[in-house]
């Protein structure tokens, strides 16, 4: 199997959005996808890119992707990667593609002197959790992810909360 991991190109915002939608469908979260191709293109390739996307190909076929951004740990005093999305198309799972994407990102961290690669996983996604544990990931059970969005975000911004 010929595998290639490469950075997404500016003409692939539609492909990236399609992969986001495939991931959302797998996670039963399709109803939450609000992103448009224009929004994805701007985040990845606009005047102030703040997002990165690496595409995995197998034998010339798009197999999956990793969407990530640079974060910072005040504890370590160094940057790291926050992996927003990792997805391998179902027909191509079990071939090492997910591990290759994570290895690629770990390499980015090591090469740049960054301290960590971090992400979240849905608690019901047992296959992914087991896979992540098998590559040395530690589940941070003592942490709870918080989110403020929609009307609550607006209210907070206006000082009503």
Model-derived segments and spans:
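Conserved acyl-CoA
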Residues: 89, 100-116, 138
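Conserved beta-strand-loop-alpha-helix junction that forms the acyl-donor binding cleft
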Residues: 119-128, 147-151
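Glycine-rich acyl-CoA binding loop
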Residues: 56, 94-99
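Conserved beta-strand in the GNAT
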Residues: 55, 61-70
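A short beta-loop-alpha structural element at the N-terminal edge
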Residues: 4-18
């Amino acid at each position: 199997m010929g595998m290639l991991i490469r950075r997404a190109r500016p003409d692939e915002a539609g492909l990236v959005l399609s992969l986001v939608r495939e991931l959302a469908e797998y996670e039963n979260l399709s109803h939450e996808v609000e992103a448009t191709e224009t929004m994805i293109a701007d985040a990845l390739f606009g005047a102030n890119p703040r997002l990165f996307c690496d595409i995995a190909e197998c034998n010339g076929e798009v197999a999956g992707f990793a969407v990530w951004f640079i974060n910072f740990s005040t504890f370590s005093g160094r940057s790291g990667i926050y992996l927003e999305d990792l997805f391998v198309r179902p027909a191509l799972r079990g071939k090492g593609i997910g591990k290759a994407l994570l290895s690629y990102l770990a390499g980015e961290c090591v090469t740049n002197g960054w301290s960590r690669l971090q992400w979240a996983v849905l608690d019901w996604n047992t296959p992914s959790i087991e896979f992540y544990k098998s590559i040395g990931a530690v589940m941070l059970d003592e942490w709870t992810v918080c989110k403020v969005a929609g009307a609550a975000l607006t209210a907070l911004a206006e000082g009503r909360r």
